[in-house]
Amino acid sequence: MLVLGIESSCDETGLALYDTERGLLAHALHSQIAMHREYGGVVPELASRDHIRRALPLLEEVLAASGARRDDIDAIAFTQGPGLAGALLVGASIANALAFAWDKPTIGIHHLEGHLLSPLLVAEPPPFPFVALLVSGGHTQLMRVSDVGVYETLGETLDDAAGEAFDKTAKLLGLGYPGGPEVSRLAEAGTPGAVVLPRPMLHSGDLDFSFSGLKTAVLTQMKKLEAAHAGGAVLERAKADFARGFVDAAVDVLVAKSLAALKATRLKRLVVAGGVGANRQLRAALSAAAQKRGFDVHYPDLALCTDNGAMIALAGALRLARWPSQASRDYAFTVKPRWDLASLAR
């Protein structure tokens, strides 16, 4: 089965072709980072318009790269939610228009399910069941993944997602957009232990997260430093230490909660998905913990940590292989800007 995947939930336009026998044939991605940088964040209307401009050229790109023809495609999967309403509508409209014109079925995919399943795109995918740490700009969750569509929420953030905390801390430090990668790069120049920040809910006894207090702690300590050194020169030199302190604190919490989830479920496989999963400090800490504790940790390829069409094509193919009745030919679609992943549980 050959499935075309279309991702347009936020500020990346992604298209891909996935074959259930041959794997990922081709994927193409356009990021809107440069367009949104001058505004310091994603502008929804601009994002929607750019998806319209980019989708069809990307389709031609993946068809050319894969050698496939439109007649070879068996179904079209698109991101149905969650995400920006306008951006979702663009992707859904394009998917259903193509499907109508080509006489193909469609299937709407949960964006986070795509992330959860994205590590299955590697050469040696992890078998079910596993614990998944889903960590991105909008979500931070620990899930038990028993099979496609069989998900149990173990813990989640009570306020800011980890990626959101990265972005907000970047703004406090006067860094550019997107903030998460900038904070991580600056942290590598910081001195370990020079700035010590709290580890929120580290010993809460559950698997939930909270990152809003960590961001506030950065702001409070920065203000104290500014007051002590009027001129700001010391503060400029200290920014790397603040970034290091923030990243160390966030990583410590993510690793500790992941270990606790593995212990609670008695599983030995951890999958890390979402944009923050590309963070080098997080990967290094989890790899060290895996070696010490005797469990396996799996990641998608770095290029597939961000939003992409490959994960949507994969999720669509896996769902249609198990539940062919989920394919739709009525082309009357809806999008779900808010959509609880737990609602997919079978």
UniProtKB/Swiss-Prot annotation:
The lineage of its organism: Bacteria, Pseudomonadati, Pseudomonadota, Betaproteobacteria, Burkholderiales. Its EC number is 2.3.1.234. Disulfide bonds: none annotated. It comes from Burkholderia pseudomallei (strain 1106a). The keyword Metal-binding applies. This is tRNA N6-adenosine threonylcarbamoyltransferase. CDD domains: ASKHA_NBD_TsaD_bac. The keyword Transferase applies. Required for the formation of a threonylcarbamoyl group on adenosine at position 37 (t(6)A37) in tRNAs that read codons beginning with adenine. Is involved in the transfer of the threonylcarbamoyl moiety of threonylcarbamoyl-AMP (TC-AMP) to the N6 group of A37, together with TsaE and TsaB. TsaD likely plays a direct catalytic role in this reaction. Signal peptide: none annotated. It is an enzyme of class 2 (transferase). It catalyses: L-threonylcarbamoyladenylate + adenosine(37) in tRNA = N(6)-L-threonylcarbamoyladenosine(37) in tRNA + AMP + H(+). GO terms for biological process: tRNA threonylcarbamoyladenosine modification. Substrate binds at residues 134-138, 167, 180, 279. Binds 1 Fe(2+) ion per subunit.
